[in-house]
């Protein structure tokens, strides 16, 4: 998110396909629903902070992948501490459980540990300077373990998910990172 002059700008970003599949992706009801879980959760969390404005859902191209994207702006009623905004917004259902409770977050950490996944996947980081703040969440990464390179990835699983499609999405995300780093 970006915070500038009492206005918070953030986005819902969820649903993934290859850029070559953009047209079919635009009508994929499962991917739209997955995106809407994220967008609606953000709106619900932000509505108490001020006047919210959700922009139209569009498709954002990021390298070889496309994702559904909805910009969200909030005119804050009062100044909010940055750490409160980070904890309010992170993780969204794109990276974490829904509903997000201490129990479901604990379950996610336990599953990640059991699967050998890094517990710190999707960490927020940012810059705060002269009243301006920008916080990003790093969701694509590589990790070295001695001579080996790991490229973790995740996907949103909802009731309509099909296992073969989710495995494909995981592979697409890892391939996009590998191509950037040449591994």
What are these language model-derived features?
Residues 1-33, 37, 120, 129-154:
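An anion-binding catalytic pocket shared by soluble metabolic enzymes
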Residues 9-111, 182:
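Contiguous alpha-helical scaffold segments within structured protein domains
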Residues 74-183:
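Conserved hydrophobic core element of enzyme catalytic domains
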């Amino acid at each position: 998110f970006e915070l500038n002059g009492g206005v918070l700008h953030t986005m819902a970003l969820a649903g993934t396909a290859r850029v070559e599949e953009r047209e079919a992706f635009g009508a994929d009801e499962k991917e739209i629903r997955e995106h809407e879980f994220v967008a609606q959760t953000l709106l619900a969390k932000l509505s108490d902070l001020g006047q919210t404005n959700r922009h139209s859902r569009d498709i954002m191209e990021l390298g070889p992948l496309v994702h559904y994207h909805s910009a969200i702006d909030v005119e804050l009623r009062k100044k909010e501490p940055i750490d409160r905004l980070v904890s309010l917004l992170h993780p969204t259902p794109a990276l974490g459980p829904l509903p997000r409770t201490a129990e479901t977050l604990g379950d996610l950490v336990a599953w990640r540990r059991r699967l050998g996944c890094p517990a710190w996947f999707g960490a927020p980081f940012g810059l705060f300077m002269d009243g301006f703040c920008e916080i990003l969440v790093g969701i694509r990464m590589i990790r070295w373990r001695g001579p080996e390179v790991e490229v973790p990835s995740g996907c949103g699983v909802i009731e309509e998910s099909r296992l073969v499609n989710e495995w494909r999405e995981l592979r697409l995300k890892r391939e996009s990172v590998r191509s950037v780093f040449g591994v």
